[in-house]
């Protein structure tokens, strides 16, 4: 009887314990313990620690610093500790925690280490995405076949002939190696072997699931990888049987959990109090007039800072919406061969959109200058890589490279000014291209090119529904975001997570083009959206490193020139103030904010060009008025939502099943990268080595690093800038409506029941009382903002306090 189905099922089961890892050029922040989310958080981190070796809670030093800085409310901490059965002073308990977590390093298995060394060498060669000049032979046949072909020439394999003589089928190899092991051991064996190199196996898992161009051309699977690994282990005589040792409970875990809950409750309490108070004020206020402009930003925490400063400069209204602007598309820029997903990883692209030239003269200028630059780059690359010319080229050009290196190191700002000046001679794509959004009745791969009119109307209506829009200003700007860094392998981690680690400008341009379509506007008016004739939609992109907002104004008529001029001036002022705030957060002088952020963007020796989403801890779903007068310190995701325009709860359902899941991914990536950077992060950028355009090593080889670098999280050694807290979501809506959504989506309720994030609802229909989710769709009353109405607040199910 064939065991092939059992092997496949066992591998699929084991693979859930390894998080997917996206290539570094399109880095996606995701929960490294996503496969454990069906378990309570406390149990998940314990099992992950046993399998992967990572810590699940912040260190004693981190808790102590938070307590000293006032980030943990002493009364809340006392209550949490008492409930957990701890009666001693927090400082004494922290000392006890420190003693309990001191443990000896685990022993290393020499045979397994040797197998890891061999495999990582060939994995890096096989999975290379364009950086190697000489490719691994026979990659088209798949990893297992290619590995068999090169193994006999690898002197690091003790008996290479054994590998070369393996069966052609990877399943047969696995069957042979596991023949002496009962089937009930297969899943644990696969789990241990996948967890041995979680970076590489996470990349294989993601690549196989994605089925992109590289995977189609050079296929690899976990089956082929495990066949090669098991064969190597068998060849070196390594033991395969899983350990029977039971998991020793971490004696400090329960105590650390109490400290973590108190820290989270301290932050959440302040956030909920703010939202509840503003909810009361919002109910008592009259609607204002038509704003001078409306700007829609990504829900990204970095947007909170620039939005706050824009609103302070004039009569502007800002909104938060997922940064892909609701368009699940694959995007191909002008004159590029590669398409990228421009939507969250939890969605599959539904359309192919490309840039098409509309201005022949500007296109000609772009092509001419780009051609000169590309030709020069190609000549230099050829001279460097050719064995016959490399030495002479280095001898001739070395002094010039040395001067350039010194200039970029000592005066990066001036060098960047020169690059910018040269770059201005080459028009940007958006200056002569428009996104091809009209349906073309053709396909690129499996995706239709463009969008039908009905699809355009649906995407625009969905955006306005989710944000609760009822009025439109003369200018409406959809503003994507991107970062600007130099010599940074992790640059995509600073771009838009909702666009799968790519810039959000293209999505903003697509939605603006859709909304300017007269046929679309007519259909929107039929659906109740009163769009004035003088409303113009446009796109822009927020540079999160420098806080510059670039406006793409090709769609703006002369009648709106004064509006646009005023907006540009106010955006410049907002940039100065936001850049000052960011510079100060990085320990620099706030008075030189713009120049300092520009330097960080240009300096190739700068390991911290910006903080990214460090500090993220909250997600507020509700009208902007709830937070517009509050400094949230760039720590909260903000999604616009108006419960009064969403009677059936469909908009709320879309937000909870989409953006809330993505923000939880981001939050857990930052959490685990902070609490154990060696296992779940990627260590220091200073010692990173990029490999294959897919990831980085720490040092000169080994496993791919899976998370965020230290410089994105830590102000200094053992001093986190990011406060490692699980996400606190606050929703402004009737609590019964939220309960209905959770009841319809068990996966959301599971995340909450298992404490991967928290949820609080401020109910405007119940005198703005706040309700905190407990479990099993039950709620407890948190606070009472108004004493005017003595009626007891109610929810579908309210747990006893």
Swiss-Prot record:
One of its GO terms (cellular component) is plasma membrane. GO terms for molecular function: zinc ion binding. Its main location: membrane. Residues 575-596 are annotated as: Disordered. It is a peripheral membrane protein. It is found in: Cell membrane. InterPro entries: DabA. Its cofactor is Zn(2+). It comes from the Archaea. Keywords: Cell membrane, Membrane, Metal-binding, Plasmid, Transport, Zinc. The keyword NAD does not apply. Zn(2+) binds at residues 298, 300, 481, 496. Forms a complex with DabB. Belongs to the inorganic carbon transporter (TC 9.A.2) DabA family. Part of an energy-coupled inorganic carbon pump. This is Probable inorganic carbon transporter subunit DabA. The gene is dabA.
């Amino acid at each position: 009887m064939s065991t092939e189905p059992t092997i496949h099922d066992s591998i699929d089961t084991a693979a859930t314990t390894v998080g997917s890892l996206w290539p570094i050029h399109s880095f996606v922040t995701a929960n490294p313990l996503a496969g454990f989310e069906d378990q309570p958080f406390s149990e998940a981190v314990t099992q992950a620690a046993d399998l992967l070796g990572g810590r699940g809670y912040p260190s004693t030093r981190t808790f102590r610093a938070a307590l000293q800085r006032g980030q943990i409310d002493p009364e809340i901490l006392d209550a949490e500790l008492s409930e957990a059965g701890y009666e001693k002073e927090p400082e004494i308990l922290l000392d006890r925690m420190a003693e309990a977590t001191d443990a000896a390093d685990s022993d290393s298995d020499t045979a397994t280490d040797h197998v890891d060394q061999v495999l990582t060498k060939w994995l890096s060669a096989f999975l290379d995405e364009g950086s190697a000049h000489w490719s691994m032979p026979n990659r088209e046949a798949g990893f297992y076949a290619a590995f068999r072909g090169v193994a006999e020439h690898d002197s690091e394999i003790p008996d290479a002939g054994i590998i070369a003589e393996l069966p052609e089928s990877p399943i047969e190899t696995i069957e042979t190696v596991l023949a002496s092991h009962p089937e009930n051991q297969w899943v644990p064996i696969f789990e241990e072997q996948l967890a041995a190199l979680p970076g590489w196996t996470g990349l294989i898992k993601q690549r196989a699931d994605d089925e992109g161009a590289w995977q189609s051309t050079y296929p690899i699977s976990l089956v082929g990888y495990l066949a090669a690994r098991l064969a190597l282990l068998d060849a070196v005589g390594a033991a395969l049987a899983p350990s029977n040792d039971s998991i020793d409970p971490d004696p400090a875990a329960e105590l650390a959990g109490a400290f973590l809950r108190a820290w989270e409750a301290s932050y959440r309490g302040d956030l909920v109090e703010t939202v509840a108070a503003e909810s009361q004020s919002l109910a008592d206020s009259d609607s204002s007039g038509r704003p001078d402009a409306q700007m829609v930003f990504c829900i990204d925490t970095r947007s909170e800072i620039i939005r706050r400063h824009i609103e302070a400069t004039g009569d502007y209204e800002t909104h938060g919406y997922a940064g892909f602007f609701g368009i699940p598309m694959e995007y191909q820029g002008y004159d590029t061969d590669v398409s990228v997903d421009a939507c969250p990883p939890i969605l599959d692209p539904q359309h192919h959109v490309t840039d098409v030239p509309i201005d022949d003269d500007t296109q000609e200028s772009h092509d001419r200058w780009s051609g000169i630059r590309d030709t020069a780059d190609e000549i230099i690359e050829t001279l460097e890589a050719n064995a016959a010319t490399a030495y002479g080229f280095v001898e001739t050009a070395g002094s010039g490279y040395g001067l350039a290196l010194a200039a970029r190191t000592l005066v990066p700002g001036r060098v960047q000014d020169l690059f910018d000046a040269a770059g201005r001679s080459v028009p940007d794509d958006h200056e002569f291209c428009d996104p091809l959004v009209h349906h073309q009745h053709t396909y690129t791969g499996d995706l239709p090119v463009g969008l039908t009119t009905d699809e355009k109307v649906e995407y625009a209506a969905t955006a306005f529904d989710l944000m609760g829009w009822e009025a439109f200003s003369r200018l409406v700007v959809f503003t994507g975001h991107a970062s600007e860094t130099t010599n940074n392998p992790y640059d995509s981690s600073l771009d838009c997570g909702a666009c799968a680690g790519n810039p959000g400008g293209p999505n903003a341009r697509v939605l603006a083009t859709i909304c300017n379509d007269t046929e679309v506007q007519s259909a929107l008016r039929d659906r109740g959206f009163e769009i004035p004739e003088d409303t113009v939609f446009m796109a822009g992109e927020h540079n999160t490193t420098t806080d510059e907002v670039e406006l793409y104004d090709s769609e703006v008529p002369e009648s709106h020139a004064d509006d646009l001029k005023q907006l540009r001036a106010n955006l410049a002022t907002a940039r100065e103030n936001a850049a000052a705030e960011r510079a100060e957060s990085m320990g620099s002088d706030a008075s030189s904010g713009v120049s300092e952020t520009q330097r960080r963007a240009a300096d190739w020796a700068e390991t911290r060009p910006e903080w990214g989403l460090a500090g993220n801890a909250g997600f507020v779903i509700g009208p902007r008025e709830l937070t517009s007068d509050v400094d949230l310190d760039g720590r909260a995701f903000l999604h616009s939502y108006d419960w009064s325009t969403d009677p059936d709860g469909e908009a709320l359902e879309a937000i909870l099943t989409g953006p809330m899941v993505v923000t939880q991914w981001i939050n857990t990536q930052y959490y685990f990268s902070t609490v154990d950077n060696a296992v779940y992060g990627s260590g220091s950028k200073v010692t990173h080595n990029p490999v294959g355009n897919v990831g980085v090593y720490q040092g000169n080889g080994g496993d791919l690093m899976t998370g965020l670098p230290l410089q994105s999280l830590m102000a200094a050694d053992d001093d986190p800038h990011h406060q490692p807290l699980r996400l606190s979501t606050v929703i402004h809506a009737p609590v019964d409506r939220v309960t209905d959504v959770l009841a319809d989506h068990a996966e959301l309720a599971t995340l909450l029941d298992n404490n991967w994030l928290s949820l609080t609802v401020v109910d405007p229909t119940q005198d703005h009382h706040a309700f905190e989710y407990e479990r099993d769709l039950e709620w407890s009353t948190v606070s009472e903002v108004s004493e005017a109405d003595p009626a007891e607040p109610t929810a579908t199910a309210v747990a006893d306090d």
